[in-house]
Regions:
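Extended alpha-helical targeting/anchoring segments
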Residues: 1-355
């Protein structure tokens, strides 16, 4: 098996204290992102799978698996924690005396790697989420809600193994980032990197792990429970209208959280969502104490080569019974003044945020 770069070229960058990646490429026409996730993760925590689906039917070009983080960063309210021993102890967090935004900016700069030409842009870096409550880091918004979930407001992993599926080329690229460490020679660092890649290749070549566990849940499905009553939700909507009429706000999203018992593995929920949901972007994060499973109909924002791209969606219609009805509904959406105004508002909001 061949690895890139060569040990000689790796040593040249390593001795200059330059972070870099080591990678290998395999043919992947018989593998899927889900099967690879099951083989590579195999019950490990702090793993993730990001998939793109074009049009809800045809799998998109890139899907990404990440695992074995060497570093985990998280924050709750104003408290920031980092674990630089994540490979050996996933709970070894230390508190940082810095703001969440400043510490994350520093970590992004620390984790930045100039990738060789030809590698996808997601071949190294930080992967995770920022929750809605993170808005309070930049806006003075009161927080009168109880923290009844107890999950971090933001959490990012720095995986030491990244598996990138390229459906256009039918290949999978296995990547391991390497940050120079004092006392570790370039030879030892390169050997460790190639061993990580070799182990991943072996995992991909084996059969799917067999477990004696149920693949379907109970036939009796409980009714979802909301965290608010119908009357309370109506009052929230009326209050929002009052704020809009008073000129205090011009957009708000009233929400409620539904909960239901789930006795299967989180991956089972993701697989069901993947099959049934038409949204083109799906994500699965399996952390130590909780998991996040979801999908999105839009990219929303992309930053690449110093260019910010906003692609907000607005306006919905029920799908037509045939192609002709779909085209008519699409034309109706494009000509609807209300939908056009909402698009312009979302673009203005995005421009304001970027500015």
């Amino acid at each position: 098996m061949s690895y890139s770069p060569t040990a000689e070229n790796f040593a040249k960058s390593y001795q200059k204290d330059i972070a870099q990646v080591v990678w290998t490429t395999l043919v992947a026409d018989l593998e899927t992102p889900v099967s690879a996730m099951l083989k590579l993760a195999d019950g490990r925590s702090n793993t993730f799978l990001l998939e793109s689906v074009e049009g809800g039917k045809v799998r998109g070009r890139f899907s990404i698996i990440g695992m074995n983080p060497d570093l985990i960063w998280k924050f709750s309210r104003e408290d920031v924690f980092i674990n630089r021993k994540a490979r050996t102890d996933s709970k070894s967090f230390e508190k940082i005396n810095d703001s969440p935004i400043d510490s994350l900016r520093s970590l992004i700069a620390e984790s930045s790697i100039d990738l060789p030409e030809g590698l996808p842009p997601m071949a190294a870096g930080l992967f995770g989420y920022m929750g809605y409550d993170a808005v309070r880091l930049s806006e003075k918004i009161p927080d009168n809600n109880n923290d009844d979930l107890g999950v971090p407001d933001g959490l990012f992993l720095r995986p030491s193994l990244i598996c990138i599926f390229d459906r256009l080329e039918d290949i999978v690229t296995l990547v391991t980032p390497v940050w120079p460490k004092s006392g570790v020679s370039s030879e030892a660092a390169y050997e460790a990197a190639t061993e990580r890649l070799s182990a991943a290749v072996s995992d991909l070549q084996r059969s799917l792990p067999f477990r004696r566990e149920r693949l379907v849940g109970s036939k009796q499905i409980d009714e979802p429970l909301s965290n608010t009553s119908r009357e309370e939700f109506h009052e929230m909507v009326n209050t929002a209208k009052d704020y809009i009429n008073a000129g205090d706000i011009f957009q708000v999203v009233p929400s409620q959280r539904f909960s239901i018992p789930f006795d299967l593995q989180p991956m089972a929920l993701y697989r069901s969502l993947r099959r049934l949901n038409p949204s083109p972007y799906l994500f699965f994060f399996d952390f130590d104490e909780f998991s996040i499973v979801g999908s999105s109909p839009e990219i929303l924002v992309t930053l690449r080569d110093e260019t910010v791209t906003l692609r907000p969606l607005a306006g919905t219609r029920k799908r037509g019974a045939n192609t002709e009805e779909d085209k008519a509904l699409a034309k109706e959406l494009l000509e609807d003044p209300k939908e056009r105004a909402e698009h312009l508002m979302l673009l203005d909001l995005g421009r304001n945020d970027v500015g």
